[in-house]
């Protein structure tokens, strides 16, 4: 996908990038056809974030690219401080472009006396002056309802779809790595015109190991596991092993957000997975031969262009 440049109509537009993923910001700006605007991002001696906008933004429509990935708290705070600086500099509007939305997993009260942190983060973003959110594959779709401003939740499946078709797999089938991800996997299966199977993880009794039940048949199939994020990689690695034991020819995992915490890379290297495909929504620090990274920068660039020109975003995915 290639964003149509709009240099002739960019007088009221500026795009900034935080320090969370500068390479992504540069790639988006390249697709749009003009450079990032400048800001000095630093820290005081005690670790407090200090930001100075280096050019006039008075009356401009601002887009800030900043995934709230590791270190989550620093990157979130940097975003909020930058928004405050821009608002106090008389920006006309401020849109936060969050390829990865951190704190999305705490979207409900799953136990007594716990926070709903996703809602709290939404409140913070709105209170500081963010007027629109562009993000991708939210962990829970209902997070869009935590905001009282427009939220464009993009689908990473648009790049995965093209990649899978280029592989020319002989007997592909889509799989959800757990019951909770069925809706997401079904959506992708429908897009691809493929069947769906489910890996059902159960613990029959306390202190017993988990049993991986597969709903459907993976025998002699090229299985494509679909998830929104890969964190510790435990779930997809266990699912891949169960699928191979049932006779799957190959197992590939698609995960929009490569969080890859702890020993995730080691698990993937030693797993039954043949390939793991992720996007560059988060900077990939560690390398692994099994991991393929697809860029979504052109997708975000085109969405930014469409929003700036008041064009439909949904038509990209239909």
UniProtKB/Swiss-Prot annotation:
GO biological-process terms attached to the record: 5-phosphoribose 1-diphosphate biosynthetic process; purine nucleotide biosynthetic process; ribonucleoside monophosphate biosynthetic process
Pfam families linked: Pribosyl_synth, Pribosyltran_N
Residues reported to bind Mg(2+) 2: 178
One example GO MF annotation: ATP binding
Known cofactor(s): Mg(2+)
Details of cofactor binding: Binds 2 Mg(2+) ions per subunit.
Binding-site residues, Mg(2+) 1: 139
Positions that bind ATP: 46-48, 105-106
Major localisation: cytoplasm
CDD domains documented for this protein: PRTases_typeI
Pathway: Metabolic intermediate biosynthesis; 5-phospho-alpha-D-ribose 1-diphosphate biosynthesis; 5-phospho-alpha-D-ribose 1-diphosphate from D-ribose 5-phosphate (route I): step 1/1
Assembly and oligomerization: Homohexamer.
Entry function: Involved in the biosynthesis of the central metabolite phospho-alpha-D-ribosyl-1-pyrophosphate (PRPP) via the transfer of pyrophosphoryl group from ATP to 1-hydroxyl of ribose-5-phosphate (Rib-5-P).
Annotated protein name in UniProt: Ribose-phosphate pyrophosphokinase
Species assigned in the record: Helicobacter pylori (strain J99 / ATCC 700824) (Campylobacter pylori J99)
């Amino acid at each position: 996908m290639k964003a149509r440049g709009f240099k002739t109509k960019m007088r009221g537009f500026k795009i900034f990038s935080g320090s969370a993923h500068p390479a992504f910001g540069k790639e988006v700006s390249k697709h749009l056809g003009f450079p990032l605007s400048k800001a000095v991002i630093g820290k005081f001696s005690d670790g407090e974030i200090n930001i100075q906008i280096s050019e006039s933004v008075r009356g401009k429509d601002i887009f800030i690219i900043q995934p709230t990935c590791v270190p989550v708290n620093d990157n979130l705070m940097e975003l909020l401080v930058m928004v405050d600086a821009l608002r106090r500099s008389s920006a006309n509007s401020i849109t936060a472009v969050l390829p990865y939305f951190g704190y999305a997993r705490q979207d409900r009260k799953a136990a007594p006396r716990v926070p709903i942190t996703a809602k709290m983060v939404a409140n913070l973003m709105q209170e500081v002056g963010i007027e629109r959110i562009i993000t991708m594959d939210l962990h829970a779709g209902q997070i869009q309802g935590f905001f009282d401003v427009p939220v464009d939740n993009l689908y990473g499946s648009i790049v995965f779809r093209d990649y899978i078709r280029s592989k020319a797999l002989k007997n592909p089938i889509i799989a959800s790595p757990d019951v909770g991800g069925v809706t997401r996997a079904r959506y992708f299966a429908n897009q691809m015109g493929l069947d769906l199977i489910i890996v059902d993880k159960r613990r029959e009794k306390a202190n017993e190991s988990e049993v991986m039940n597969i709903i459907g048949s993976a025998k002699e199939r090229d299985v494509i596991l679909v998830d929104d994020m890969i964190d510790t990689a435990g779930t997809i690695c266990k699912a891949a092993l169960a699928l191979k034991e049932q006779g799957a020819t190959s197992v590939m995992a698609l995960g929009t957000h490569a969080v890859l915490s702890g020993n995730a890379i080691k698990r993937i290297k030693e797993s039954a997975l043949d390939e793991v495909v992720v996007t560059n929504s988060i900077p990939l620090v560690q390398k692994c031969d099994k991991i393929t990274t697809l860029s979504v920068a052109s997708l975000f660039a085109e969405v930014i262009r469409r929003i700036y020109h008041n064009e439909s975003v949904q038509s990209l995915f239909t």
